[in-house]
Amino acid sequence: MTTNNDFYFALLRISILQLLKAQGFDRARPSLVDVMTDLYAKFLSLLASEVSSIAQARCDQDDTIALQDITLALENLGIVKPTNVLDVYDENSELSSSRGMEKFKDWCIYSTQLTDARITALPTVELLQSEEKESDPLSAIPDYLNQLLQNKGAKQKLETKNRKTELIEDLINNNGLDDWIKLVIARQRINMIERASKKESQNVPALPHIAGYKSSILSRHHHTTITNEDRMPSAMTPRDEDALTEIQENPFVTSKLPIMRKENRLENITLSFEDEELESLGEVEGPNQKSQENNNEESFKENNKSLTESPHGDDRDISMFQFDSNVDTKWAEQEDMDSTFQRRTSLDYGGYF
């Protein structure tokens, strides 16, 4: 962050540059300018402190700085040399003791150096018209080869130059060259004009081909139908009902959703591993396959029917494996547990049956 001392030092540095230019110095190193500025600031503070000390030593009632305080401070610092410091015997009584101050006054009023310094301190039109030379790699190529490249952007450069000329003429007619602040503002406006001219035009039809640009909202037919007011974002209400109503009233927004397009619907989406030829063959073979399945079912039913029928052609044989309701299905061994155990023992140890 810049402090106050750095800010004032930079302002004083501009004055030193103008003084050096008025004395005939066209250029100087930045380090030399900084040294001259530092010496000027030190000497000015020394002069101010000397004037203040002399005014305090005079013991005046109002404690104001008088002209003799400044004169004596200039003499003490050696800026003005007095004609006669002490004339004890009054040998040169007719000689004026303020002759040095009179010469200093004449130098301040009639000096050509100060006049040149004032002229140098004023802003000039050349400061606004100064342009940096840019290296042109096509300068070595003949004009008949790079004529198209040279004519590229010539119209835009001409418009920028005309705007700069109008701005400078307006500043001259309004006597704006006597004020550095007006000149700085004009310089900033010119920089903005130059910066805007260097930007490439963002024209949508002039852009190169982009994949998917035809169905995009930036396409030409969408670009011509939409107004500038439609492109501005509208503030949504905090309630969901109002937002839903606004969306329903403006179907153009929902029509731009990808899901609203036919090619993006689920029934129209096919996977990469699906074979369309197999699907077509399946559609052709579908009726034959159904008829074959029906024949298999009929043959299966006939086989089951043949198994259930009697080999002798008698209906009574069908129920040969069915038990009568009077037949007791329980074994005799279940009635007598002892005989059951004996039977099992005989079976295990090789007894009689």
UniProtKB/Swiss-Prot annotation:
Localization terms from the record: Nucleus
UniProt GO cellular component terms: nucleus; transcription factor TFIID complex
Region (Disordered): 279-353
Keyword Transcription regulation: yes
Any one Gene Ontology molecular-function term assigned to this protein's record: protein heterodimerization activity
CDD domains per the UniProt record, alphabetical: HFD_SF
Coiled-coil intervals, chain numbering: 289-309
PTM sites of type Phosphothreonine: 237
Keyword Nucleus: yes
One Pfam family named in its UniProt record: Bromo_TP
Chief localisation class: nucleus
Location of Phosphoserine modifications: 310, 346
Family annotation (InterPro entries): BTP, Histone-fold
BP-aspect Gene Ontology terms: positive regulation of transcription by RNA polymerase II; transcription by RNA polymerase II
Keywords: Coiled coil, Nucleus, Phosphoprotein, Transcription, Transcription regulation
Functional description taken from the UniProt entry: Functions as a component of the DNA-binding general transcription factor complex TFIID. Binding of TFIID to a promoter (with or without TATA element) is the initial step in pre-initiation complex (PIC) formation. TFIID plays a key role in the regulation of gene expression by RNA polymerase II through different activities such as transcription activator interaction, core promoter recognition and selectivity, TFIIA and TFIIB interaction, chromatin modification (histone acetylation by TAF1), facilitation of DNA opening and initiation of transcription.
Extra information: Present with 3300 molecules/cell in log phase SD medium.
Protein name stated in the entry: Transcription initiation factor TFIID subunit 3
Lineage: Eukaryota, Fungi, Dikarya, Ascomycota, Saccharomycotina
Gene behind this protein: TAF3
